[in-house]
Amino acid sequence: MRRRRGRLPRVPQDEQNRQVTPELAARALAGSFPGDLGVELVEIGDGRVRGRLAVDRRHLHPGGYVHGGVWVAFADTVAAWGTMRHLQPGHDFTTVELKTNVFAAARDGDTLAAEGELLHAGRRTQVWEVRIRNGDRLAANFVCTQIVLAPTS
């Protein structure tokens, strides 16, 4: 289904915070960039988020390994849903800084597992770390800062 620009599903403000669940995430991700990548949220809890990505051909660069942008998009999505759970009602957010280190390659058929942890939750920022594993091996580490946006009148 093709959506018009600016018409992607949004999580209603009244469903944020404690109501943020993997089921809500799945509905909101449908038809969006992370949803098209196949990002799944498995658990969204206090200070912790877990996600999964089954690697297939669309995730690979021409050399046959997972593209760098996929690592970042996967981790940023995990951190974003954790951020949403910890917002005050009516607030929004956006990523203002991120860093990713990839330690091990992933290929078609691998399943990546991400675990995000809230490192800092202030009034104006949240900092998240996301560790991505490929099997038993740490494959990537991601740290991002989210700026919290107050409601506009």
What are these regions (language model features)?
Residues 2-153:
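Terminal targeting signals and extreme-terminal segments of soluble enzymes
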